[in-house]
Every structure is written in structure tokens, then in C-alpha cells.
Swiss-Prot record:
Keywords: Angiogenesis, Cell membrane, Chemotaxis, Disulfide bond, G-protein coupled receptor, Glycoprotein, Membrane, Receptor, Sulfation, Transducer, Transmembrane, Transmembrane helix
Glycosylation: residue positions: 22, 32, 198
GO molecular function, one term: chemokine binding
Protein name: C-X-C chemokine receptor type 3
Record function comment: Receptor for the C-X-C chemokine CXCL9, CXCL10 and CXCL11 and mediates the proliferation, survival and angiogenic activity of mesangial cells through a heterotrimeric G-protein signaling pathway. Probably promotes cell chemotaxis response. Binds to CCL21. Upon activation by PF4, induces activated T-lymphocytes migration mediated via downstream Ras/extracellular signal-regulated kinase (ERK) signaling.
Membrane topology classification: Multi-pass membrane protein
Gene (UniProt): Cxcr3
PTM annotation: Sulfation on Tyr-27 and Tyr-29 is essential for CXCL10 binding.
Annotated source species: Rattus norvegicus (Rat)
UniProt topological domain (Cytoplasmic) ranges: 78-89, 147-168, 244-255, 322-367
Annotated spans, Disordered: 339-367
């Protein structure tokens, strides 16, 4: 059961000074949310035992589902690479980002189950890789939303002229921003031995103010801004589709709603918990042992919900799409024929037939 502590058990001045001078916060983007740092002397048995049981199982499951699902999306997209639209290219990058993110989960599973055994170098790389692809997923979804907004609402294709150059530049900017946001991981993450827990963990080594600043950056740049872009774009798209004619509008409306709802449902709970933690960091909410234990467990559960978005992406952007199943089946059939008869040349077709793009939908994925 949760640790029941009186609300009067608020940090005194000596506890706060100890926290600011000795804080070594863990990697705080969800994969290891228990405070393994030299935090105020609160018992952490419940949250640590919960993480050791819950996180390894969850991360292993998400690793398998995310790898298989996004691998299937990437395979189908690459099979149509000569006819990819701008949104298709963003979706391919999104699948790659999700794959790279889930590839770090086994490392964090080991860290949660026992301790970090991979050294400081891999700690920095794994932490930065996770952070880069966390931001990349949100930014690419925003790019897809904006591309659909221009195409459907304004009937404008900004990537029609020199499409490969413009799409490539957009992707370079997105990945560049993600690397920039991950610089603190390269600098401050390290494998540190926690004497209180007698274990080594991949964690940040900087004052509490730096930990709070990173959480605010994640909340604003990695969640609120992309969500606002998606909500604005898809609200206008829905307005246009509601006055359009034909049965296709209902299918497009369903997918549009699912896009925004899935992102919000998966990530909103986690960021609300992070907001509570930020408010405790800055003193707006009193930090006590009971509340801290509840927040630690809540971060573990809600971060798992957020990572589920990597597994949902193939379902939302592929399996719900109009032509993905058909293209996946054709790809499997071609692979089967290749094994039996040797390599065969794919029949030529027009861009409209082979591309994942249509006039009112972004791609065969159905966006």
C-alpha cells in the first residue's frame, strides 16, 4: 500500500539545503522515474519495489510491440520509396524515431530491475538517444499535422516544388533541434553510485534547478507546443471535412480525431504528474514523503502510458489506414515469390497508384 505520511511532514530548511547541494537526479524522461538521488530522507521502499516489478515487464513488452509494429510500417513505406509523399517521409522518420526509442527500453529495464551496469558512456548515449527520439516523435507529428493542414484547408503543397530538398531540410531541422535538446544528456548524465541505495544508476549530476529546468523544457517543447499545433491544424481540417461531400470524409474525420486523441491520452497523464513534481520543486506544493511516494509511482505508470504511443503509432497511422493492409500483403507476397522464384522486378505504376498520398488523405496510412 502507499506510504501514509502526515501532510505536516514538510521539508525543513536543512532538508532543502541538503537537496540542492547533493542532488543527483535520475534520468527523468520516464524510463527511470524513482528518485535514486540523494533526496530528502523519505522511505522509498514502495516506489522502488514497484519500479523493479512493473517497469522491466512493461519495457520488455513495449520493446517487442514497438519494434515489430514500427518495423512493419518502415518496411511498407520503404517498399514504396520511389513514390513517397512528404507525409510518407515524415511517417518513415517517425517509425525510425519510435524504433530508436524502444531500443533503449531494455537498458532502462535492467536499470530499474537492478542497477546500471553499462558504464557512463552508454548511459550518456542511451539517455540522449531516448531524449532525441522522444522529441522527434512529437515534432514529426506536428509536421504531419501542418502538412495536412496546408493540403486540405488551403489546398497548398509546400513540398510540391523540389519536394525531396524541402522535406529533407525539414527533417534535418527537426533532428537538429532534437539533438540540441539532448545536449544536457551528453553533458550531465553519468553512471553514479548511490551510497544510500548501494547501487549504480544512470542519473543526472547537477543542482535541483537544472532538473526543474529540463522538466519545464520537456513539458513545453515536447508536449504542449506539438499538441497545440496538432489541435489547431486538425480543428481546421475537421471544419473543412464537415462541409465536404462523399463517404471518405467520415473515414478521414475518424482518423483525424484518433490522431489528436491518442497523442493527448498517452502523454497528458504523464505531463500532469511532471507538472505536480515541478510545483513541488519550486515550492508551490509542499513536498512530503507521502506525496513524493505517490508522485514517483504515478510517474512510472503514466510514463508507461506515454511509451505506449510508440506502439500505437503503427495502428493509428497504418493499420487503420485505407491501403496499409493491402500494401503489407503485397509486400509479403513479393517476398514469398522472391524466395521461390528469385528476384523479380516490381510492376511499374503511376505515382498516384503507388504513392501513399491521395488528394484528401496524406497517405496509404490514412492521415
Amino acid at each position: 500500500m502507499y506510504l501514509e505520511v502526515s501532510e505536516r511532514q514538510v521539508l525543513d530548511a536543512s532538508d532543502i539545503a541538503f537537496l540542492l547541494e547533493n542532488s543527483t537526479s535520475p534520468y527523468d524522461y520516464g524510463e527511470n522515474e524513482s528518485d535514486f538521488s540523494d533526496s530528502p530522507p523519505c522511505p522509498q521502499d514502495f516506489s522502488l519495489n514497484f519500479d523493479r516489478t512493473f517497469l522491466p515487464v512493461l519495457y520488455s513488452l513495449l520493446f517487442l510491440l514497438g519494434l515489430l509494429g514500427n518495423g512493419a510500417v518502415a518496411a511498407v513505406l520503404l517498399s514504396q520509396r520511389t513514390a513517397l509523399s512528404s507525409t510518407d517521409t515524415f511517417l518513415l522518420h517517425l517509425a525510425v524515431a519510435d524504433v530508436l526509442l524502444v531500443l533503449t527500453l531494455p537498458l532502462w529495464a535492467v536499470d530499474a530491475a537492478a542497477q546500471w551496469v553499462f558504464g557512463s558512456g552508454l548511459c550518456k548515449v542511451a539517455g540522449a538517444l531516448f531524449n532525441i527520439n522522444f522529441y522527434a516523435g512529437a515534432f514529426l507529428l506536428a509536421c504531419i499535422s501542418f502538412d495536412r493542414y496546408l493540403s486540405i484547408v488551403h489546398a497548398t503543397q509546400i513540398y510540391r516544388r523540389d519536394p525531396w530538398v524541402r522535406v529533407a531540410l525539414t527533417c534535418i531541422v527537426v533532428w537538429g533541434l532534437c539533438v540540441l535538446f539532448a545536449l544536457p544528456d551528453f553533458i550531465f548524465l553519468s553512471a553514479s553510485h548511490d551510497q544510500r541505495l548501494n547501487a549504480t544508476h544512470c542519473q543526472y549530476n547537477f543542482p535541483q534547478v537544472g532538473r526543474t529546468a529540463l522538466r519545464v523544457l520537456q513539458l513545453v517543447a515536447g508536449f504542449l507546443m506539438p499538441l497545440l499545433v496538432m489541435a489547431y491544424c486538425y480543428a481546421h481540417i475537421l471544419a473543412v471535412l464537415l462541409v465536404s461531400r462523399g463517404q471518405r470524409r467520415f473515414r478521414a474525420m475518424r482518423l483525424v480525431v484518433v490522431v489528436v486523441v491518442a497523442f493527448a491520452v498517452c502523454w497528458t497523464p504523464y505531463h500532469l504528474v511532471v507538472l505536480v513534481d515541478i510545483l513541488m520543486d519550486v515550492g508551490v506544493l509542499a513536498r512530503n514523503c507521502g506525496r513524493e511516494s505517490h508522485v514517483d509511482v504515478a510517474k512510472s505508470v503514466t510514463s508507461g502510458m506515454g511509451y505506449m504511443h510508440c506502439c500505437l503509432n503503427p495502428l493509428l497511422y497504418a493499420f487503420v489506414g485505407v491501403k496499409f493492409k493491402e500494401q503489407m500483403w503485397m509486400l509479403l507476397m513479393r517476398l514469398g515469390r522472391s524466395d521461390q522464384r528469385g528476384p523479380q522486378r516490381q510492376p511499374s505504376s503511376s505515382r498516384r497508384e503507388s504513392s501513399w498520398s491521395e488528394t484528401t488523405e496524406a497517405s496509404y496510412l490514412g492521415l
